[in-house]
């Protein structure tokens, strides 16, 4: 199976745009490959603190205005997760199954839950 390996944060709106764009282009061509292997790059740990919902909201406003107006329909600063660690644990479990389709789908489902459905995936 062909794979594109990316390191990405679950709560980063730029990652959401990039991953969706890759999957959209793949689908437009009627392809099921390459699959994305989305590796953990937790900005919460890199930065030493959780991401700020209002800062993310400002980034989303800019992304919708300039790049992908079709994304982020359900985003809400009020339900933005206070942590990404629970979600990263879930993606790690999906990755351990060895099923690349499942791992990609779980990673995208978590991002869609935050950015398209306005869900707080930081609750344990």
Predicted ranges, named:
Residues 8-11:
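Short pre-active-site segment immediately N-terminal to redox-active cysteine/selenocysteine motifs
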Residues 16-119, 123:
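Structural alpha/beta surface segment adjacent to cysteine/selenocysteine redox centers
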């Amino acid at each position: 199976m062909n794979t594109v390996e990316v390191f990405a944060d679950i709560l980063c709106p730029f990652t959401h745009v990039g991953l969706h764009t890759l999957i959209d282009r793949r689908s437009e061509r009627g392809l099921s490959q390459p699959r994305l292997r989305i590796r953990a790059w937790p900005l919460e740990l890199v930065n030493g603190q959780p991401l700020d919902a209002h800062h993310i909201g400002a980034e989303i406003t800019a992304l919708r205005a300039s790049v992908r107006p079709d994304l982020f329909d359900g985003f809400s600063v009020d339900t933005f997760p206070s942590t990404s660690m629970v979600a990263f644990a879930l993606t790690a479990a999906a990755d351990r199954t060895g099923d690349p389709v499942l791992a990609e789908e779980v990673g995208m489902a978590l991002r869609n839950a935050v950015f398209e459905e306005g869900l707080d995936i930081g609750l344990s």
